[in-house]
Amino acid sequence: MSHAKEDYDSSYDPYSYQADYDGHTGDPKQDLAYERQYEQQTYQVIPEVIKNFIQYFHKTVSDLIDQKVYELQASRVSSDLIDQKVYEIQDIYENSWAKLTERFFKNAPWPEAEAIAPQVGNDAVFLILYKELYYRHIYAKVTGGPTLEQRFESYYNYCNLFNYILNADGPAPLELPNQWLWDIIDEFIYQFQSFSQYRCKTAKKSEEEIEFLRSNPKIWNVHSVLNVLHSLVDKSNINRQLEVYTSGGDPESVAGEYGRHSLYKMLGYFSLVGLLRLHSLLGDYYQAIKVLENIELNKKSMYSRVPECQVTTYYYVGFAYLMMRRYQDSIRVFANILLYIQRTKSMFQRTTYKYEMINKQNEQMHALLSIALTMYPMRIDESIHTQLREKYGDKMLRMQKGDAQIYEELFNYACPKFLSPVVPNYDNVNPNYHKEPYLQQLKVFLDEVQQQAQLSTIRSFLKLYTTMPVAKLAGFLDLPEQEFRIQLLVFKHKMKNLVWTSGISALEGEFQSASEVDFYIDKDMIHIADTKVARRYGDFFIRQIHKFEELNKTLKKMSQKP
């Protein structure tokens, strides 16, 4: 689907919620749900160590905001003091919060914002940030997951956060670590995805819950989410900044009043990746890649400071290429990011959620790469190829023989969790309605697999000969000659891909064939050419020699220790 820029006019605010939600509505069912939410709240005793932590967390954020206000009044973008405060917040966010969660709230929620509000002087901005972490923890770790009310409240909190950032008269006096900014965008889309699937599963829901969903169609609406992401992109002027950056210019020169601040610049960049993800979940792969048209994927960028953002970008771009039948580009993207993960895996602590997420996407991308290489055999990095053979060697052989069940199994494991942007008809919801987006994408994928079912066998026969009568080769395959000619045409068509060669836009490219065999038909004779490039063993041996030398040095150092 194509979205014109005016569809996301920031003056239109579909993600704003009804003001009367916080009071009685006159609807008995809605009021009952509202009252039940507060009746069930239990005011837990907050441990002293948590009180001290929250006060310290608040003071750090408050000091940063005060300093940022001063910097803005002095017309300065940033300073060493701001950087120092951001570093302190990063330590709190990535270390202290995680350790205290593990110790006190492993499977239980943190104290509610209302309970800690007196500790922080009812600081509205801090409470919004606290609730962002509070609800995210409920989604990730709390047994049973979020209730319907918590899903709604988390949505309202994101509305408050984005309104604070987007609707201020000037740049908001706030800076946050890049990791937290990425996690905000990532979690925002995840919660939308989770709610989209939740509202489609009506079998176990009470009439009260269904009525509550029916009367609040704007909550977690797809237009709300798109509007937020596009507003952040527009506010930051990130596309223009990237355009100038990739052409060798200074992005600051076109950043504008908001985009020169790290908060807006990074949220804008992460929102582009968020749009890539969202359009992929909706099955619009062309639009998914189009939003990245100013990001040069094949070049290390100053904006790529968060590993999870890098991995997510390459996962969705690689998957979109696969579904667009651009196998060569899909293979290149997956191989590049898998090599990156292989070389940087030691950076991630094995106990953190980061490691879990990256490890899962690493496994999924290996599965997708095995599919792409089966459908379009070509050479890739030796170390990645070795890993692939270890993990999926047997399944790749079965896929080469046309086993559709293995294709489906790997696709099911590795594909994104597709969703429908449409609110279901609650009066008549199919029990499998939540599966329909996945089944639609699976059908598209398996149709393509079916079209290529004979190609692997044809390729293996073509490799054996230089010339062969068409009728004879058709006989080997037990196909009528006319059907075999059709399959040869399919082979020619499917082995020719649109391939990115240069330029910034990932949609650009030229038609190429990387098939190891090529042929032409002259009258009733097939003439076959082996286009396989001889393997360069020299590079492989040089890499192994370097590894051996490093190992030798390490062993010598160990032997020298007293």
Curated annotation (Swiss-Prot):
GO terms for cellular component: eukaryotic 43S preinitiation complex; eukaryotic 48S preinitiation complex; eukaryotic translation initiation factor 3 complex. Its main location: cytoplasm. One of its GO terms (molecular function) is translation initiation factor activity. InterPro entries: eIF3l, PCI_dom, TPR-like_helical_dom_sf. Residues 11-20 have a biased composition (Low complexity). Residues 329-535 form the PCI domain. Residues 1-29 are annotated as: Disordered. Keywords: Cytoplasm, Initiation factor, Protein biosynthesis. It holds the Pfam family Paf67. It is found in: Cytoplasm. One of its GO terms (biological process) is translational initiation. HAMAP family: eIF3l. Belongs to the eIF-3 subunit L family. Component of the eukaryotic translation initiation factor 3 (eIF-3) complex, which is involved in protein synthesis of a specialized repertoire of mRNAs and, together with other initiation factors, stimulates binding of mRNA and methionyl-tRNAi to the 40S ribosome. The eIF-3 complex specifically targets and initiates translation of a subset of mRNAs involved in cell proliferation. Component of the eukaryotic translation initiation factor 3 (eIF-3) complex, which is composed of 13 subunits: eif3a, eif3b, eif3c, eif3d, eif3e, eif3f, eif3g, eif3h, eif3i, eif3j, eif3k, eif3l and eif3m. This is Eukaryotic translation initiation factor 3 subunit L. It comes from Xenopus laevis. The lineage of its organism: Eukaryota, Metazoa, Chordata, Craniata, Vertebrata. The gene is eif3l.
